[in-house]
């Protein structure tokens, strides 16, 4: 395996997931490039006024990082937390959660699956 691999923006690919509304998802690297294929880095663009996800789970641990905008994070316990630019949240595997864009601009979130 190479010691490093550069991925240019024209090499990214977009995809859709059923639980995501008004959301553009972009995979930022090929998971096969990571030893063991266990790390996935994606970027989510949530449109203003309600773009987001339904409650969903991931089989892997996740880290969400808000790169731009304001997102309302809700965990399975119903607690809501406003996430703003620079905030992050660690999510245990198989934990239900959802996020909603509550700002007036497109929100951008980096998603790291471990």
Role assignments for model-derived ranges:
Residues 27-30, 40-58, 80, 93-96:
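Conserved short histidine dyad/triad with adjacent acidic residue
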Residues 44, 63, 90, 104-114:
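A short hydrophobic beta-strand segment most commonly corresponding to one strand
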Residues 45-47, 57-73:
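Short, conserved beta-strand element in jelly-roll/cupin
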